[in-house]
Amino acid sequence: MLSILRNSVRLNSRALRVVPSAANTLTSVQASRRLLTSYSSFLQKETKDDKPKSILTDDMLFKAGVDVDEKGQGKNEETSGEGGEDKNEPSSKSEKSRRKRQTSTDIKREKYANWFYIFSLSALTGTAIYMARDWEPQESEELKKDIDNGYTLSLMYKRFKARFNSMFTYFQEPPFPDLLPPPPPPPYQRPLTLVITLEDFLVHSEWSQKHGWRTAKRPGADYFLGYLSQYYEIVLFSSNYMMYSDKIAEKLDPIHAFVSYNLFKEHCVYKDGVHIKDLSKLNRDLSKVIIIDTDPNSYKLQPENAIPMEPWNGEADDKLVRLIPFLEYLATQQTKDVRPILNSFEDKKNLAEEFDHRVKKLKDKFYGDHKSGGNWAMTALGLGNSLGGSTKFPLDLIHEEGQKNYLMFMKMIEEEKEKIRIQQEQMGGQTFTLKDYVEGNLPSPEEQMKIQLEKQKEVDALFEEEKKKKKIAESK
């Protein structure tokens, strides 16, 4: 292009030399000026259009994660600002190109997502149809209650709803329908069952930055459990999970002499956002069950069986010991139903104080009538004339007898503790490893029984020797 312009300039200059007239000279000069002006404007335009361009295309930038549309939009705004046209209009062209631009990975991802949605919808539909099927013989009667078989929409919905709700009852109900085994036969059976909580009644746990977690045992807890164990089947029902409360329960009764069974939060019924200790799950007659707890939610299903107590904060008190006379009276009177007696107290939280007040009145009446030869109180308590001419109040006689039995029982427990300690020392070395199991070196059940009997004889012999040594030491 430049060479053409140069040649044209040279030709014009030659023409000017050939024609010497002034008019022709002026015309040629004007033509040269116009030609130079157009040439300079062409050079300026070429300089503007000849800006440096990147070797990275829009596709390469898009794959790398660069937002090409924003960049292009910025350029469009700049161009529109310069030209003064289409300043506020969106770049529909760039949006369309963005929608169309998809990599192979995006196509695969969209394909898999569609298949996942189809599979999920099919699975949910199939599950719903399966759960709405007719009842099967092995399903529980409680689940099938008031819902018949059939494939009408209403019946299918009811069966689906019943089966769907039953899946959540697994987490709301206790692990077993009967939390306790059947009671022993009458000669060995305690007349009443006493369910007591652990936290803030027998023990109190608190945390401090200096000492961490510490657990305090309430004054009189050992006496409370030991004394009432001769009258009641004691069930320790903790409000905490087993992993936290099991060790504390073992410390309270290491040889299981006082507490018959331990239950924990896992055995509660979860209802309305709270854990409830449902006494109907204990496999016991509710007319013979008493629960002592500090949380009203724990006994909200059977409040008539409850003795509410204030939570213990760790300070020394005698409320456990003061509760014993009433519980002893209740167990020794051959009560058919404990609920009317419990509900006869206006304020159950102060039951011990109110019972002491009643006993005091009855005792004054008894001694007043005894002076005049009356014996109505003994008859009212079911003792008749079995106490002969004793002037002691019947409840005092019952307490004295219970105290004697308690001392004898505790003496036997101390001996049993020593025997259990010796047994644990002797049985500690009797273990079998995984290697013995793999190699088949385990003894047969008959051989294991013989080994245990021999060990038990050794334990009994060592225990008798320990008793003889103690007697000799005491005699000296």
From Swiss-Prot:
<comment type="subunit">
    <text>Component of the TIM23 complex, at least composed of TIM23, TIM17, TIM50 and TIM21. Interacts directly with TIM23. Interacts with preproteins in transit.</text>
</comment>
<protein>
    <recommendedName>
        <fullName>Mitochondrial import inner membrane translocase subunit TIM50</fullName>
    </recommendedName>
</protein>
<dbReference type="GO" id="GO:0005743">
    <property type="term" value="C:mitochondrial inner membrane"/>
</dbReference>
<keyword id="KW-0496">Mitochondrion</keyword>
<dbReference type="InterPro" id="IPR023214">
    <property type="entry name" value="HAD_sf"/>
</dbReference>
<dbReference type="GO" id="GO:0006886">
    <property type="term" value="P:intracellular protein transport"/>
</dbReference>
<keyword id="KW-0813">Transport</keyword>
<feature type="compositionally biased region" description="Basic and acidic residues">
    <location>
        <begin position="67"/>
        <end position="95"/>
    </location>
</feature>
<keyword id="KW-0811">Translocation</keyword>
<dbReference type="GO" id="GO:0030943">
    <property type="term" value="F:mitochondrion targeting sequence binding"/>
</dbReference>
<keyword id="KW-1133">Transmembrane helix</keyword>
<dbReference type="GO" id="GO:0042802">
    <property type="term" value="F:identical protein binding"/>
</dbReference>
<feature type="topological domain" description="Mitochondrial intermembrane">
    <location>
        <begin position="132"/>
        <end position="476"/>
    </location>
</feature>
<dbReference type="InterPro" id="IPR036412">
    <property type="entry name" value="HAD-like_sf"/>
</dbReference>
<comment type="similarity">
    <text>Belongs to the TIM50 family.</text>
</comment>
<keyword id="KW-0809">Transit peptide</keyword>
<feature type="transit peptide" description="Mitochondrion">
    <location>
        <begin position="1"/>
        <end position="43"/>
    </location>
</feature>
<keyword id="KW-0472">Membrane</keyword>
<dbReference type="GO" id="GO:0005744">
    <property type="term" value="C:TIM23 mitochondrial import inner membrane translocase complex"/>
</dbReference>
<feature type="region of interest" description="Disordered">
    <location>
        <begin position="67"/>
        <end position="105"/>
    </location>
</feature>
<feature type="transmembrane region" description="Helical">
    <location>
        <begin position="115"/>
        <end position="131"/>
    </location>
</feature>
<dbReference type="Pfam" id="PF03031">
    <property type="entry name" value="NIF"/>
</dbReference>
<dbReference type="GO" id="GO:0005739">
    <property type="term" value="C:mitochondrion"/>
</dbReference>
<dbReference type="GO" id="GO:0045039">
    <property type="term" value="P:protein insertion into mitochondrial inner membrane"/>
</dbReference>
<dbReference type="InterPro" id="IPR004274">
    <property type="entry name" value="FCP1_dom"/>
</dbReference>
<keyword id="KW-0653">Protein transport</keyword>
<feature type="domain" description="FCP1 homology">
    <location>
        <begin position="187"/>
        <end position="330"/>
    </location>
</feature>
<feature type="topological domain" description="Mitochondrial matrix">
    <location>
        <begin position="44"/>
        <end position="114"/>
    </location>
</feature>
<keyword id="KW-0812">Transmembrane</keyword>
<dbReference type="GO" id="GO:0046902">
    <property type="term" value="P:regulation of mitochondrial membrane permeability"/>
</dbReference>
<comment type="function">
    <text>Essential component of the TIM23 complex, a complex that mediates the translocation of transit peptide-containing proteins across the mitochondrial inner membrane. Required to direct preproteins in transit and direct them to the channel protein TIM23, and possibly facilitates transfer of the translocating proteins from the TOM complex to the TIM23 complex. Does not act as a structural subunit of the TIM23 complex but plays a dynamic role in protein import. Has no phosphatase activity.</text>
</comment>
<dbReference type="InterPro" id="IPR050365">
    <property type="entry name" value="TIM50"/>
</dbReference>
<dbReference type="GO" id="GO:0030150">
    <property type="term" value="P:protein import into mitochondrial matrix"/>
</dbReference>
<keyword id="KW-0999">Mitochondrion inner membrane</keyword>
